[in-house]
């Protein structure tokens, strides 16, 4: 196995206007400080404050948004990174692993990957994703792309429909249809950072948010060796060349992951499990006492010094022992959070170190907190109680259904842009308004300038005389609509839907 040298992974160069020459430790740290500034000051991060964590359209500021959740993940990620570096230092391994001059960048990459990990999520979270994918599948029918005879293809878009005698073009059509129908928040995050926001981050920093390594256009079985790493789409066809370059710069084998991404993932797992339960109590879905009993019964067999007693039981007893200075509710979650972090962070750090050869190679085919240990069982306990008692609550389900309808409705409203012919839409893009298309002109004007420019730039580079042009133009037109709607906040999407459906009070 190749030696572990993080100097080959923590690549401080950029796609554009990259720093040149040999850099000192301080100069490299400044490059990653620049990344931090670009990320923290980006509109994509600000929009997280009005995007759903669990409870859509929530007016109670004490309940988490995507932004407050991401800040908590950032803190836990920093904690895990510091724990890893501290343990490696104690074993005199920092220099051997090429980290002695890169501890600052190591921490910074993890922190900013944690802060960015949700930036591609659409309004209303997973229900927004489902709405986008269902809407496009009902029109593009990606499953029919393998149909025989080709006349069975139900795709409603003529340029994407399979044609006899056009096998090479049909392959592209299949790829495009699959890609469009697999919108995914992590893949959209890569698209935001590179294509839409043009943040020009270092290769290492972008590698930190490439959580899944399966391209969205993938068809067929996934290799067992990468089943976990490829369980969801990680990037789109539109970013294929960029990801190929990223892999080269970070020395990543096909479908392998950047090492520090495992830390971001563990931080997210630790953070949201406790946070979702705390938000449910804040929303009065259940009381702290009811939550404790849910956790107690879901754990199963109890022993005196079990992990449950050391973490959950200890938090419950301490919160009941002193109710003078703080409420039981507040104290319980303070102790639960502290106890959980004190157990899971060192464990995650040690798992990273113990599996470092595979993690460095990018092939470790599971999460750090996904094993047969009691620590993994504790996380599963939190998740299972949330699924059974929070996500299935009628109020939560009603809001999710409303969110699904809002996103589906917005796609219906913007559908005329996708129904235009290639020539008509090209003319609309050029002139911005066409008298013979009054509705389409007004819809086009509502699209953000950033998204329109991204469409124009990529389509202008396509060879117009090629047979692929109509297929790829329509692909990027679909991306244009998806970019715009997925970039909305929950509240903006809700308000926009009500305005355009003429139900505004």
From Swiss-Prot:
Keywords: Hydrolase, Magnesium. It catalyses: dGTP + H2O = 2'-deoxyguanosine + triphosphate + H(+). Its cofactor is Mg(2+). Its EC number is 3.1.5.1. It holds the Pfam family HD. It comes from the Bacteria. The keyword Iron does not apply. It is an enzyme of class 3 (hydrolase). One of its GO terms (molecular function) is dGTPase activity. Coiled coil: none annotated. InterPro entries: dGTP_triP_hydro_central_sf, dGTPase, dGTPase-like, dNTPase_1, HD/PDEase_dom, HD_domain, PHydrolase_assoc_dom. PROSITE patterns: HD. CDD domains: HDc (cd00077). Residues 66-273 form the HD domain. Belongs to the dGTPase family. Type 1 subfamily. dGTPase preferentially hydrolyzes dGTP over the other canonical NTPs. Homotetramer. This is Deoxyguanosinetriphosphate triphosphohydrolase. It comes from Salmonella arizonae (strain ATCC BAA-731 / CDC346-86 / RSK2980). The gene is dgt.
């Amino acid at each position: 196995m190749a030696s572990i040298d993080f100097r080959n992974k923590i690549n401080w160069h950029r796609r554009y206007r990259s720093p040149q020459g040999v850099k000192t430790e301080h100069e490299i740290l400044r490059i990653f400080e620049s990344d931090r500034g670009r990320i923290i000051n980006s509109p994509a991060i600000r929009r997280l404050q009005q995007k759903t964590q669990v409870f859509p359209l929530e007016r109670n500021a004490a309940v988490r948004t995507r932004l407050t959740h991401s800040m908590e993940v950032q803190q836990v990620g920093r904690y895990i990174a510091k724990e890893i570096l501290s343990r490696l230092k104690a074993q005199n391994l920092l220099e051997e692993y090429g980290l002695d001059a890169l501890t600052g960048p190591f921490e910074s990459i993890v922190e900013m990957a944690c802060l960015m990990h949700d930036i591609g999520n659409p309004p209303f979270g997973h229900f927004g994703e489902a709405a986008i994918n269902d809407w496009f599948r009902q029109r593009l029918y990606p499953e029919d792309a393998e149909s025989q005879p080709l006349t069975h293809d139900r795709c409603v878009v003529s340029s994407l429909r399979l044609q006899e005698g056009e096998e090479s073009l049909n392959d592209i059509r299949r790829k495009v249809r699959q890609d469009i129908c697999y919108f995914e928040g992590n893949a959209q995050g890569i698209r935001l950072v590179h294509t839409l926001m043009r943040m020009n981050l270092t290769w290492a920093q972008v590698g930190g948010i490439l959580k899944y390594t399966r391209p969205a256009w993938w068809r067929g079985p996934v290799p067992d060796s990468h089943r976990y790493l490829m369980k969801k789409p990680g990037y789109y066809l539109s970013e294929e060349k960029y990801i190929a370059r990223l892999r080269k710069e970070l020395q990543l084998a096909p479908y392998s992951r950047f090492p520090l991404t495992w830390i971001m993932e563990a931080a997210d797992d630790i953070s949201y499990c406790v946070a979702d339960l705390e938000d449910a109590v804040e929303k009065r879905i259940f009381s702290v006492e009811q939550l404790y009993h849910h956790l107690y019964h879901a754990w199963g067999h109890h022993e005196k010094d079990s992990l449950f007693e050391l973490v959950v039981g200890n938090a419950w007893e301490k919160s009941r022992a002193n109710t003078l200075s703080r409420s039981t509710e507040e104290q319980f979650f303070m102790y639960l959070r502290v106890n959980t972090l004190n157990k899971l962070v060192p464990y995650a750090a040690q798992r990273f170190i113990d599996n470092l050869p595979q993690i460095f190679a990018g092939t470790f085919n599971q999460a750090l907190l996904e094993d047969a240990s009691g620590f993994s069982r504790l996380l599963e306990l939190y998740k299972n109680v949330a699924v059974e008692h929070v996500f299935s609550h009628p109020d939560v389900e009603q809001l999710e259904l409303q969110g699904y309808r809002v996103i589906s409705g917005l796609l219906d409203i913007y559908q005329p842009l996708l129904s235009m012919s290639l020539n008509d839409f090209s003319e609309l893009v050029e002139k911005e308004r066409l008298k013979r298309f009054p509705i389409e002109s007004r819809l086009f004007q509502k699209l953000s300038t950033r998204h329109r420019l991204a469409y124009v730039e990529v389509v202008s580079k396509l060879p117009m005389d090629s047979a692929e042009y109509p297929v790829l133009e329509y692909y990027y037109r679909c991306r244009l609509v998806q970019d715009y709607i997925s970039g909305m906040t929950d509240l903006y999407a809700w308000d926009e839907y009500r305005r355009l459906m003429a139900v505004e009070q």
